[in-house]
Amino acid sequence: MDSNRINRAGSPEAPMEYVRSQEHHDLFRQAVNAVGGSVAAPAPAKAPIWSSSAPYGSFSRDGYSWNNDVWGRGAGPQTISVYGANQWSVWSNQPATGGIKSYPHEAVHVGKPLSAINTLSSTFTQDVPKGGAWDTAYDIWDSSNQHEIMIWTNYTGNPDGSGNVKPISYHYRQDPSGAAIPVYRNVQVGGTTWNVFEGNNGHNVISLVPISKSNSGTVDIKGILEWIKSKGYFGDINVGSVQYGVEITSSPGGMNFKFSNWAVTSK
């Protein structure tokens, strides 16, 4: 372990070289609205190809999968809608109470040892509300589901671990902020500066929270996993699924989250 650590612990794993990108999905091409690569997606003009309000409603097509994933206590209604391979949205009406209510998301399966991956990166574009309590994040699992890596992109809390959403942590400040305490601060990986948090929710969880919030960009997942490995959290893990969505704690009155241009490149 590194002598610069502020606290302590950590650990992600499942086959097949592929490149997931919008250009390679001819089956979906007519179902996807044209969107710019650097701006948030407009509201889809067409009817969805699939929609569900079931708590665990799920849909798979052409190597992608989606799940409504409403799992928290006291959760309200939520509807996920898919318009194409890289375009989907969720309407969610969650009460202003504590605790995550849902994590609607899109996912692809990687299924390779980290050492066998030369490139693992992802692009995202999103349109999010100003209110509520939520964080948009990648959720990356090893194949054994022992280790979970969360990479936040935007959130309603603060980068120091305070605010109305907080990353999982072993340690929280004993003051009114109740802020999660990072194990590393101002880490530069993949062109982004992060605060890093460590905790356990039944799995070993490492969360990277960017100092600057963003609604579009590219994430160097391979670089992040290698950095975590270099700190002794795990060895040559088998990277399982890469998910992207929004952890919703509250969205009173109903709020819309829209996602487009999401793609994962692995080779």
Residue spans of the language-model regions?
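Short, compositionally biased, intrinsically disordered N-terminal export/targeting signals
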Residues: 1-25, 29-37
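Extracellular carbohydrate-recognition regions
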Residues: 39-70, 155-157, 163-168
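Short carbohydrate-recognition loop motifs
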Residues: 73-101
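Extracellular-facing segments of soluble proteins and assemblies that are Gly/Ser/Thr-biased and enriched
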Residues: 98-182
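Conserved, mostly hydrophobic/aromatic
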Residues: 191
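Short, surface-exposed, low-complexity cationic segments
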Residues: 197-222
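Long, compositionally biased interface segments
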Residues: 214-267
